[in-house]
A protein has these predicted regions:
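Internal alpha-helical transmembrane segments of multi-pass membrane proteins
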Residues: 2-3
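Contiguous transmembrane helix-bundle modules in multi-pass membrane proteins
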Residues: 6, 10, 29-159
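Aromatic-anchored segments of alpha-helical transmembrane domains
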Residues: 12-22
Length: 159
């Protein structure tokens, strides 16, 4: 169950670490965390493109062999909560990626220099973080496979 999803998350994580290294080492991103400009930036960008291309091709080509016969029976199960946490973490990563890359895209398209500051990240990350906290609190008490309403009420009832 979820083998293709797990492999996709693994490949995306590795590719995004290479992208982050490119952004900080190439001088494209102006930040207190960025390093001085060096000539290694294009190599990281090429490596990033290679990793993404190979990952997409291999997952597309061999994805049918990775698919397991099982599936998530209910969203109100432990595996459903874990998958929900995965989706929320992926959304959180997308919010951070968008906040990091958006000023670069605007500058490339319009030539305008903009800045995405703390209010954007606070506004976007707070609901995702609260949902993550809720799911992390509820997931351990959910049963595997399927949960009935009565069982959920009993396990989530405050003593």
């Amino acid at each position: 169950m979820l083998r293709v999803w797990n492999l996709s998350l693994l490949c995306a994580t590795f590719a995004l670490t290479i992208l982050g290294t490119f952004l900080t080492r190439s001088g494209v991103l102006d930040s207190v965390h960025a390093f001085t400009e060096s000539g290694i930036g294009p190599a990281f960008l090429l490596f990033f493109a290679l990793i993404v291309g190979v990952s997409v091709v291999l997952i597309g080509w061999r994805g049918d062999r990775l698919r397991a016969p099982g599936r998530i029976d209910s969203p109100w199960s432990r595996e459903g909560a874990f998958f929900g946490n995965n989706l929320l973490f992926a959304a959180f990563a997308f919010v951070v990626l968008l906040g990091t890359v958006f000023p670069l895209l605007v500058e490339a398209v319009n030539g305008d220099r903009i800045s995405v500051g703390v209010p954007y990240f606070d506004r976007m990350a707070t609901p995702i973080g609260l949902a993550l906290l809720l799911l992390m609190a509820v997931a351990p008490v959910l049963p595997w496979r399927k949960a009935s309403g009565e069982l959920l009420r009993h396990r989530l009832y405050w003593p």
